[in-house]
């Protein structure tokens, strides 16, 4: 599930709530899922919008989101060499199992350089916007491995190479790493 505006998110939450039991059961059973951008916020217990109105998430996890009036926009470079772009106005509190343990550059769930995202079983969630998998070969491999493992197969030893995607990742990662080091 991908990102959307905060305004559209409330409508999506109402519709998504109809599937909460199905999504929770699939997650418990090990189905691989990816949530990017504001879609991640819907996995928690609740979202409080900038006007102070609260609406429920699906409750896959107990974290909560509080949206503010200040937008957080910028590049992200994870300690585990994940790259991406973030455009959000929410702080996510109480994530017990983050996808990324820390950031060298950018804003995490609650604070700058803090842990970012959510990971439970085969549910991968990040407030990074797409193309998350194309930009992050290691994350793509983790998601593909989760899909294959659930089906009882292994990723093939020899996989196709995508030199342009790999070069794009390497250039982006190197530039963001240099920017993060310059800020220290």
Regions found by a protein language model. Give the residues of each.
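Flexible gly/pro-rich beta->alpha loop and the following alpha-helix that scaffold active-site loops
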Residues: 1-35, 44-48
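Short, acidic Gly/Pro/Ser/Thr-rich loop/turn segments
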Residues: 6-8, 65-68, 92-94, 131-135
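Short, glycine/charged-enriched secondary-structure capping and boundary segments
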Residues: 13-16, 47-51, 73-74, 141-142
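Hydrophobic/aromatic beta-strand patches that form the interior of the parallel beta-sheet core
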Residues: 34, 59, 85, 124-126
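N-terminal Rossmann-like NAD(P) cofactor-binding subdomain of oxidoreductases
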Residues: 38-39
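Pocket-forming structural segment of enzyme catalytic cores
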Residues: 50-116
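Long, Lys/Arg- and hydrophobic-enriched amphipathic alpha-helices
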Residues: 98, 114-126, 138
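Acyltransferase
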Residues: 123-184
């Amino acid at each position: 599930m991908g990102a959307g505006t905060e305004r559209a998110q409330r409508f999506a939450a109402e519709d998504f709530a109809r599937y909460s039991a199905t999504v929770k059961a699939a997650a418990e059973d090990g189905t691989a899922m990816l949530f990017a951008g504001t879609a991640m916020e819907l996995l928690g217990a609740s979202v409080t919008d900038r006007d102070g109105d609260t609406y429920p998430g699906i409750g896959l996890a107990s974290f909560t989101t509080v949206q503010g009036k200040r937008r957080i926009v910028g590049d992200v470079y994870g300690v585990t060499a994940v790259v991406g772009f973030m455009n959000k106005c929410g702080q996510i509190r109480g994530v017990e199992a983050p996808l990324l343990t820390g950031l060298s550059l950018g804003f995490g769930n609650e604070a700058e350089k803090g842990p970012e995202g959510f990971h439970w079983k085969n549910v991968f969630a990040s407030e990074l916007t797409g193309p998350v998998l194309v930009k992050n070969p290691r994350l793509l491999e983790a998601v593909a491995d989760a899909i294959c493992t659930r089906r009882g197969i292994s990723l093939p030893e020899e996989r196709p190479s995508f030199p342009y995607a790999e070069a794009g990742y390497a250039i982006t990662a190197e530039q963001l790493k240099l920017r993060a080091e310059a800020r220290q």
